[in-house]
Amino acid sequence: MTVDLYNYVATVENFPEPGVNFRDISPLMGDGVAYKQAVDAIADFAKDLNVDLIAGPESRGFIVGSPLAYALNIGFVPARKGGKLPRAAVSAAYSLEYGGENVLEIHQDAIKPGQRVLIVDDLLATGGTINATREIIEKLGGIVAGVAFIIELTDLHGREKIMQNGREVPFLTLMTY
């Protein structure tokens, strides 16, 4: 059975600030059929990329990436917020969508040189989180094989920021707003 994933996204107006329509995938994750359909669609995309690992930024990248890695029988690499990892890590800073700056980190032994990595997240907004994750993967010698999202907010131009300067990679979005 195939479902319309758009029916499983709640829109919360004026959150987290006035004028913003927050796209909440909690209903999608709460429905087994919709959640499986989303993960399976990304898994089909990943199979064509011959990936070795899935990476996802904290926190909703974990929700997408973990079942995806399981479905593909490969490892998952969490990109954690700064200061959360207990061992030596590589980091990258990025700007937050609503102002400010943050840092992501990945353990320095999580990705071996030459490993092909698919970066996944629930939602693409400005591209900052994904570019920071990409920067760390490349510092570790990994190859970003592609990126995938459940939702893309097209008016924030995150796709263009990810692909800028000749850095095109295979790209999948299941829904756009």
UniProtKB/Swiss-Prot annotation:
GO molecular function, one term: adenine binding
Matches recorded under InterPro entries: Ade_phspho_trans, PRibTrfase_dom, PRTase-like, UPRTase/APRTase
Top-level class of the enzyme under EC nomenclature: transferase
Entry EC no(s): 2.4.2.7
Pathway given in the UniProt record: Purine metabolism; AMP biosynthesis via salvage pathway; AMP from adenine: step 1/1
Keyword annotations from UniProtKB, A to Z: Cytoplasm, Glycosyltransferase, Purine salvage, Transferase
An example Gene Ontology biological process: AMP salvage
Domain of life the protein comes from: Bacteria
Family note: Belongs to the purine/pyrimidine phosphoribosyltransferase family.
SUBUNIT field: Homodimer.
Primary role: Catalyzes a salvage reaction resulting in the formation of AMP, that is energically less costly than de novo synthesis.
Protein's name according to its UniProt entry: Adenine phosphoribosyltransferase
Gene behind this protein: apt
